């Protein structure tokens, strides 16, 4: 099974999460990583992509640039580019829904194999998951 998690808020990394770096970089990231790592231990799960928003902000460091930035055995972190390079707090993501959907669909189009399931974390990610279902028919679950 290939699971794609979408979590757009905060400064997500696979290791050494900078908790508190921004107001949006908190416990929800810890729970997401624990879920991904526990799922990776399941022999039926062969791949997990964590998709988040990429940005360039010298105050926050260079590691948040768009692209595939980190990889583990089964878990990969992918940062999509929505055309706005600045870090955006969660309250401002709603202004980028169209661009984020376009970037997420482009990421999915570029995959040889589509995810079996998308797990969207919070409302903004739910909008992307719904769009992926419309375009590709990929089922999704939503937690907020």
Regions found by a protein language model. Give the residues of each.
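Active-site proximal beta-strand in glycosyltransferases
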Residues: 3-4, 133-144
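N-terminal hydrophobic or amphipathic segments with adjacent small-residue motifs
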Residues: 20-21, 123
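A cross-family glycoside hydrolase active-site/sugar-binding cleft signature
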Residues: 51, 121, 141-143
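A conserved catalytic-core segment of Leloir-type glycosyltransferases
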Residues: 2-15, 22-25, 30, 34, ...
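Short N-terminal targeting/anchoring amphipathic segment
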Residues: 108-125, 139
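A short acidic, amphipathic alpha-helical/loop segment
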Residues: 128-132
